[in-house]
């Protein structure tokens, strides 16, 4: 879990740095005549957004583009959520192993790693599954950033009060992006039977990273991130409802208690008849 936290933080920091670099880097316009592959990809995304705007607003195009991307990537995000849940379910056993092998010597650490790998393999845990959506979205976000900064018909677009090619100085979108990120993380962790410091740090740390990123990004990118995380909240609620998981877990526990009570009563009754 700690490794995942460190890697997620590193990816977030990398994205923030790349955003800053993009802001201060090359700002020449990208057009249909641009020759290099990256510029063609950026312009392709821009054309999709313009098509999806239906001549209403570029903001509408970005919203529909986000929904389209998230729907296409739905299987990948579902794999991430399942992987995260498996990782969380494995934590009590991992904690027990750490208590069983507390030594700092090479032999103890090696044995601990071996036993942890066995647990992960048994429970079908692959840490890389949790990171695929982040890795896949990074080029999409960077291409969208470049499109809003360097494609003329996007960088001059507006949606409500937002100039999509400039930062949202009202901070409404960065705040919304952070709030929806927190809600999606909170929902994902709601059904945890046990929480640790790393889980709590991710729940509060990732929204902060998203907020900082959205503050310095063009309004269109902040809009993308807001809609993307709102989509994630709905996906979690309808496909991985934590309240349903908790209710099912409590029902299993209650059924076990009822079974034990019936066995106890049957045993007492049998003893009385002797």
UniProtKB/Swiss-Prot annotation:
Localization terms from the record: Cell membrane
GO molecular function term, any single one: membrane insertase activity
Membrane-spanning parts: 56-76, 128-148, 167-187, 205-225
Pfam families: 60KD_IMP (PF02096)
GO cellular component: plasma membrane
Lipidation (S-diacylglycerol cysteine): 21
CDD domains documented for this protein: 5TM_YidC_Alb3
Lipidation (N-palmitoyl cysteine): 21
Swiss-Prot/TrEMBL GO biological process terms: protein insertion into membrane; protein transport
Keywords: Cell membrane, Chaperone, Lipoprotein, Membrane, Palmitate, Protein transport, Signal, Transmembrane, Transmembrane helix, Transport
Membrane topology listed for this record: Multi-pass membrane protein
Signal sequence residues: 1-20
InterPro entries: YidC/ALB3/OXA1/COX18, YidC/Oxa/ALB_C, YidC/YidC1/YidC2_Firmicutes, YidC_ALB_C
Record's function text: Required for the insertion and/or proper folding and/or complex formation of integral membrane proteins into the membrane. Involved in integration of membrane proteins that insert both dependently and independently of the Sec translocase complex, as well as at least some lipoproteins.
Family: Belongs to the OXA1/ALB3/YidC family. Type 2 subfamily.
NCBIfam families, A to Z: yidC_oxa1_cterm
PANTHER family named among the record's database cross-references: CYTOCHROME C OXIDASE ASSEMBLY PROTEIN COX18, MITOCHONDRIAL (PTHR12428:SF65), OXA1 (PTHR12428)
Protein name according to UniProt: Membrane protein insertase YidC 2
Species, as recorded: Streptococcus pneumoniae serotype 4 (strain ATCC BAA-334 / TIGR4)
The encoding gene: yidC2
